[in-house]
Design a protein with these regions (language model features):
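Cofactor-binding active-site loop characterized by glycine-rich and histidine/acidic residues
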Residues: 33-174, 388-389, 421
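Thiamine diphosphate
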Residues: 93-105, 129, 133-137, 142-147, ...
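Non-catalytic terminal/interface segments that mediate subunit docking, oligomerization
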Residues: 312-439, 443-454, 530-539, 547, ...
């Protein structure tokens, strides 16, 4: 067994031992794809194991995140993040750096949190799009300071997921030639052979997408894998699919090629049989010959030279183009937005009724002028979402410098690509669609929140205010779903001022996603709205009494309704406070003193008004309060008719407040 074979087998052995010790995990993928990972990292990756944060590194995304021991074994052997053998031994244990699925921000070297199959594929597309855009912004003749590949590895499961078709269809259209996809084709799924549910010709499918396609017959043939990678890199106009025919659970006589190799430990006897079958020289658990460690150390040292070479190039670049250094720093360290966010223009009150989606579009373009690295788009709804960036160009195969991304009707891919754009670094991204279609993006938004990425989601057409399109297009439960997502901040603004606050928060927030939930219909500009919207909830119209008779809480389009109801109640001698609550998440983060000043415990008579699900409101109104909300689906008809039919009227709010007061 030569040193390369031993180095490949070290990945297999460490993976099998770690999974066996944890008595939990997925050995099939690491055993089958170890040669792909070794060949790629040792000979083709532009990567410095000693600095996994280097901005011009090649990215490798393991879309089949269940095979995480493939990554952890590589990280340990190459010294990436100084991942110790003890951490490998603690695989899947609470508090370890080796969780069951790779987690971005938790384990150094992990480029993306993966596990939900297919999402890693689309995040890789986002990274490749980021590389293409940044290269068009920064590169000068002879100075390719942004010049790297994005590799992604996934199996049959990833290829079955619809998101893979969405993202690769777009990647082919965009001609992302620095995207290289490894297809781990082992023809096995959890339930058995893929023949039971997946018989399509994946290669032909990718040809239709516009990919170069290459096939490696033997997944253990390092030379063939290396040749395929070089062939993929040689194509400068198309992304590439490398189909590698592998054997799941390779090397374990009782398990290889079987579904049982996928998601359970091999068993003590089978681990021993694996080591004997592949000729492993060590008998003990987690034992790797020193010569293998030495080989990986030498590889790591050689790989580090790539960054040294790039540093020299970059130093020469900034010397010749000093103006680009400031631009680079702004892109990668962030723009100072204080001038815009402290300007009178930004906080100017609107002088007429306007849909918050329209207001958002205006503010978005103000932000773009102050933050040129803003990039984003919609799932074929930009004219409705009002997300077009004026004079910023369209991102296309012929113009990677464009900032307007056209995702097509591909909401799932859009959200995951947004994650990839943010993971890459150097850009501030947003994505957009109708709020009712946020159901398509929810799994991807969950990963946005889990990775704490500051991606902005623009959701328009936020309620029964959609009107004539009817219940298929009228969100009900979506707002509650996003409010329940840990780390996701939702804003449902009532007017221009609150929309400005929402965008300011979205831009300045560096930890977690923000969702802007915006109206289709015009809303009045509220006299009492203010920057206090940044606190999540505030008094927008107060009572004259020190202790109000009741409190009405509302968000978005229902805030003006609440204020109008307050004016009617005064005629009957009832003096209420109106609280605008654009963001429950931010309000909940305020001090106890502030929350008491807005919603005093002494005032138990409370009514919340929101034209969506009532889920989540009772923690503010309590057992003595009431919620005016949607209790079922909407209907088709003029918006005004629907609001009246479903009880979102001044009369009903007045009636409900009186009932609560008793």
């Amino acid at each position: 067994m030569n040193i390369e074979e031993m180095s490949v087998n070290a990945i297999r052995v460490l993976s099998a031992d770690a999974i066996q010790k944890a008595n939990s995990g997925h050995p099939g993928l690491p055993l089958g794809t170890a040669p792909i990972a070794y060949e790629l990292f040792s000979k083709h990756m532009n990567y410095n194991p000693q600095n996994p944060e280097w901005i011009n590194r090649d990215r490798f995304v393991l879309s089949g995140g269940h095979g995480s021991m493939l990554l952890y074994s590589l990280f340990h052997l190459f010294g990436i993040g100084n991942l110790s053998l003890d951490e490998v031994k603690n695989f899947r244990q609470f508090g370890s750096l080796t969780p069951g699925h790779p987690e971005y921000g938790h384990t150094v070297g992990v480029e993306a949190t993966t596990g939900p199959l297919g999402q890693g594929m689309a995040m890789a597309v986002g990274m490749a799009m980021a590389e293409a855009h940044l290269a068009s912004v920064f590169n000068k003749e002879g100075y390719p300071v942004v010049d790297h590949y994005t590799y992604v590895l996934g199996g049959d499961g990833c290829m079955m997921e619809g998101i893979s078709s969405e993202c690769f269809s777009l990647a082919g259209t965009l001609g992302l030639s620095k995207l290289i996809v490894f297809y781990d084709s082992n023809n096995i799924s959890i339930e058995g052979s893929t023949d039971i549910a997946f018989t399509e010709d994946v290669v032909t499918r990718f040809k239709a997408f516009g990919f170069q396609t290459i096939e490696v017959e033997d997944g253990n043939d390092l030379c063939a894998i290396g040749k395929a990678i070089e062939e993929a890199k040689a194509d400068k106009t198309r992304p590439s699919l490398i189909k590698v025919n592998t054997l799941i659970g390779y090397g374990c006589p009782a398990k290889q090629g079987k579904a049982s190799a996928h998601g359970e430990p091999l068993g003590v006897d089978n681990v021993a049989a694996l080591k004997e079958n592949i000729g492993w020289p060590c008998k003990g658990d987690f034992e790797v010959p020193q010569e293998v460690y030495d080989h990986y150390k030498e590889l790591s040292a050689n790989m580090a030279k790539a960054e040294d070479k790039w540093n020299e190039l970059f130093a020469s670049y900034v010397e010749k183009y000093p103006e680009m250094k400031e631009l680079w720093d702004n892109y990668f360290d962030g723009y100072d937005m204080s001038d815009l966010f402290n300007s009178d223009e930004y906080w100017a009150k609107g002088d007429k009724a306007e849909a918050t989606r329209n207001t958002s579009g205006t503010i978005l373009n103000m932000i773009k002028k102050a933050m040129p690295n803003l990039i984003g788009g919609s799932a074929d709804l930009a004219p409705s979402n009002k997300t077009n960036l004026k004079d910023a160009g369209d991102f296309s195969k012929d113009n990677y410098a464009g900032s307007n991304l056209h995702f097509g009707v591909r909401e799932q891919a859009m959200a995951a690509i947004g994650n990839g754009l943010m993971l890459h670094g150097g850009l501030k991204a947003f994505v957009a669609t109708f709020f009712v279609f946020s159901d398509y993006v929810k799994p991807m938004a969950r990963l946005t929140a889990l990775m704490q990425l500051p991606l902005t989601y623009v959701f328009t057409h936020d309620s029964i205010g959609v009107g004539e399109d009817g219940p298929t297009h009228e969100p009900i439960e979506q707002l509650a779903a996003f409010r329940s997502l840990p780390g996701f901040t939702v804003f449902r603004p009532c007017d221009r001022t609150e929309t400005a606050a929402a965008w300011m928060y979205a831009v300045e927030n560096e930890c977690g996603p923000t969702g802007l939930v915006l109206t289709r219909q015009n809303l009045p500009q509220m006299e009492g709205s203010s920057k206090d919207a940044l606190k999540g909830g505030y008094v927008i119209a107060d009572s004259q009494k020190e202790v109000p008779d009741a409190i009405i809480i509302a968000s978005g389009s229902e805030v003006s309704l609440a204020v109008n109801a307050k004016e009617e109640l005064i005629k009957d001698g009832i003096d209420v406070r109106v609280v605008s609550m654009p963001s429950m998440e931010l309000f909940d983060k305020q001090s106890a003193e502030y929350k008491e000043s807005v919603l005093p415990n002494a005032v138990r008579k409370r009514v919340a008004v929101e034209a969506l699900s009532d889920f989540g409101w009772y923690k503010y109104v309590g057992l003595d309060g009431r919620v005016i909300a949607m209790e079922g689906f909407g209907a088709s008809g003029p918006a005004a008719t629907l609001f009246e039919h479903f009880g979102f009227t001044v009369d009903n709010v007045v009636k409900t407040v009186k009932e609560v007061i008793g």
